[in-house]
A protein has these predicted regions:
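Alpha-helical transition-metal enzyme core signature, strongest for iron centers
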Residues: 14-21, 44-59, 82-89, 93-107, ...
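Glycine/small-residue-rich hydrophobic helix-like segments
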Residues: 180-224
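C-terminal interaction segments
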Residues: 212-258
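An N-terminal domain-cap segment
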Residues: 2-49, 59
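Short, helix-capping/interhelical loops that line the mouth of catalytic, cofactor-
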Residues: 1-9, 56-109, 113-118
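Short, contiguous alpha-helical
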Residues: 32-74, 120-178, 227
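Phosphate-handling catalytic interfaces
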Residues: 117-120, 222
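Surface-exposed helix-capping loop/turn segments at secondary-structure junctions
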Residues: 27-33, 108-115, 150, 154
Length: 258
């Protein structure tokens, strides 16, 4: 396979995200696990259950990518979800951390040759290298970790090393996360930490690297961490956001979250 992306930084960020989550959960009792997460329909334990089942499923994809075997069929997922849903909040929390630790340890054990040769077909149609698969996993894990962290500390942010990687995946994610806006507007987006320049089209819900000839009618300046949370439907604090020609509520309606 050509154009393989080095997965080292993704593996490191996945480890950091897991360790951060483990630290958050370590201080929670039964009431804390049953408390609401940022998602109004999920408790903290529900988030952990989701991440635990996700770790099991991604482990199946990891095995397929390393061995060259077939990826898991969709019908393999339902028994995993049902098993997690049947567990108590305490068991969901403990098992979630255990299965994700096992996933991270497996990733860390892969040789450079195994990482470079990794190839798997996701969802039956999308070929991915290891960095691509970890991009999917990190976006899920880092944002859901924030869903828990922000309920414990309202000033919590998405982990910086995850931000550095995930900001460049926003063009890939926009179509999945966005809701097309009939009143389309082109927005020049500039971010800090790290610095990036994008053009956001709310009509087709696309994000692309800014071009030299782009002349958007609106502009948005904000930290990259806040832009990620905007795209993932999690931007409630707009103190560091400067918008012109478009409002933050209008942009939030384009990205309702998951």
């Amino acid at each position: 396979m050509t154009n393989v992306t080095d997965a080292t930084s993704w593996v490191l960020a996945a480890r950091t995200s897991h360790d951060r989550l483990a630290g958050l959960v370590a201080g929670l009792d039964g009431d804390g696990l049953r408390a609401q997460s940022y998602d109004t329909e999920w408790s903290v334990a529900d988030v952990l259950s989701h991440l635990g089942s996700g770790a099991e499923i991604f482990s199946l994809y990891l095995d397929a990518g390393v061995t060259g075997g077939d990826p898991p069929a969709p019908e393999a997922f339902m028994p995993i979800w049902e098993a997690w849903n049947a567990r108590s909040p305490e068991d969901q929390a403990a098992r979630s951390l255990a299965v994700n630790e096992a996933l991270i340890a497996r990733l860390e054990s892969l040789t450079p040759e195994q990482r470079a040769a990794f190839h798997v077909m996701m969802f039956g149609r999308i070929p991915m290298d290891l960095a691509g698969v970890l991009g999917m996993r990190l976006s899920e894990h880092a944002l859901h970790t924030w869903d828990i962290a922000v309920m414990l500390d309202p000033a919590a942010k998405v982990a910086p090393d995850a931000v550095d990687l995930l900001v460049d995946r926003l063009p890939v994610m926009a179509g999945f996360m966005g809701k097309q806006d009939p009143a389309a507007v082109a927005v020049a987006v500039t971010t800090t930490s790290p610095e990036r320049a994008f053009t956001l089209d709310t009509g087709g819900v696309t994000i692309a690297p800014a071009g030299a000839g782009d002349t958007p009618a609106a502009s948005l300046a904000l930290p990259a961490e806040a832009f990620i949370r905007l795209v993932y439907g999690r931007l409630d604090d707009a103190a560091e956001v400067t918008a012109s020609g478009v409002t933050v509520p209008e942009l939030k309606s384009v990205f309702p979250g998951f």
